[in-house]
Amino acid sequence: MSENQQALNHVVSMEDLTVDQVMKLIKRGIEFKNGAQLPYEDHPIVSNLFFEDSTRTHKSFEVAEIKLGLERLDFDVKTSSVNKGETLYDTILTLSALGVDVCVIRHPEVDYYRELIASPTITTSIINGGDGSGQHPSQSLLDLMTIYEEFGHFEDLKVAIAGDLDHSRVAKSNMQILKRLGAELFFAGPEEWRSQEFADYGKFVTIDEIIDQVDVMMFLRVQHERHDSGAVFSKEDYHAQHGLTQERYDRLKETAILMHPAPINRDVEIADHLVEAPKSRIVQQMTNGVFVRMAILESVLASRNAN
């Protein structure tokens, strides 16, 4: 393990990480991106349990595990005893008893991991791949890595996060750590989808008020599956009022970058032809997801080896 890396027992929330730990994970992710290798001779076992749909998080964790030479124990929710009524706790208790070292979990219940990491019987380490509208630490870390690669710092950067704020675990993870890192935060999007908790971290604005001032413009997916009622906006109205149109893109500073955690509703949050525009770092975010997740896995496994 790199001497610059600091071990963690679990990675479940950005609130639990220190700035020092965050920076070490970012820098280790960059080292992996630049070719650093870490073969494991003792073949640690990792199981990925996704109770919500996922492409980027699920598959990039798998690629990270392959690159690290870890043993993957596939877990298919559809064919597991979950369908017989088994609880998440008993599922993880079973995998822990079988000798699984790390479980990467995405689950619709906010804070699902609290019961697991508090258990004296469960010895497997937990990496949170997203808990409902709660936290998404690995996405936040890959976003931070992407910003750090671009600017080399966070202090005094103006970052706007726009879209479905209340339902976004990405927004909540990023706002907490970006403020601690010294960035200035702005929040845009429909008033119906932003709660007062965001006011503790930044300023509410309209996208047109801030678009030409920001260094980082981060859009969020409209999460239809987390809304209780029907659509408040048509796709066309949402895009016109809150999305990235060509006119808004043209107003971005020359050095500004465009981000989105994906999946993207094209022509809703971002105009289709702008998803891969020169200022876009969306593909880079996906690439960086592999390397920062390698750093997370390395750190968690190092903690286990130290205990």
Swiss-Prot record:
L-aspartate binds at residues 84, 169, 221. GO terms for cellular component: cytosol. It catalyses: carbamoyl phosphate + L-aspartate = N-carbamoyl-L-aspartate + phosphate + H(+). One of its GO terms (biological process) is amino acid metabolic process. NCBIfam families: asp_carb_tr, PRK00856.1. Heterododecamer (2C3:3R2) of six catalytic PyrB chains organized as two trimers (C3), and six regulatory PyrI chains organized as three dimers (R2). This is Aspartate carbamoyltransferase catalytic subunit. It comes from Streptococcus pneumoniae serotype 19F (strain G54).
